[in-house]
Amino acid sequence: SCKVNMHRGFLEFNPNKVGGDKRFHGLLKTLGTCVSKARLKRFDLAYDIPVSRYDCRLSKDRRMYKSVISNGITEYLGVKNTPAYVKVYDKAAELHLDTDKVQLTRIEMTCDGEWTAEQLEEHWPQVHAWHSESGTKDYIRVIGIMLAEKAERNEDVETLINMLGRSSRPKVREYLRTPLVRLPEGAAALMLAEAHGWCDAVVGSM
């Protein structure tokens, strides 16, 4: 037979939804009377950028990758509920906003509770974002993204670019040098402190 430790478990929640609810803080206070310590197992970091989902590209690596087209484009990289799992999706579409007027893309990453701020930044995904000029043809965007992915695999793209018309070449080349989305300076440390603060809230209520 095995013994069950009734004082060991986990709590999963979204601070944005319950962080301001007095009932939730009451729950934390109750838990504080039952446990001697609490540690951060993992947390999801969400970062929104005011860019159309069509103007974002997630760089792939050797991990499992999946793309789903439903209520916008959603890309997944890695294994769910494991550190460095990434999800990039159309937040405006999820909120049922007019995506022609509101451009909002969310980058989510699952973080290990043991990570330092430096490790969090090291695992931050390579997401490229840009602002397409009005009137940009869909085929230019598609070709540009495809060639950018080929270039990341160190495959030749110049031969293909030179097969395009003279006016299309510079437009497509722009997709080969789109900037990466980076977290604001100091943001990783602030988010870690906030995440660990919820553990302190449990222990501090003892």
Q: Predicted segment positions?
A:
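Structured, helix-rich domain cores that form ligand/interaction pockets
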Residues: 1-163, 183-205
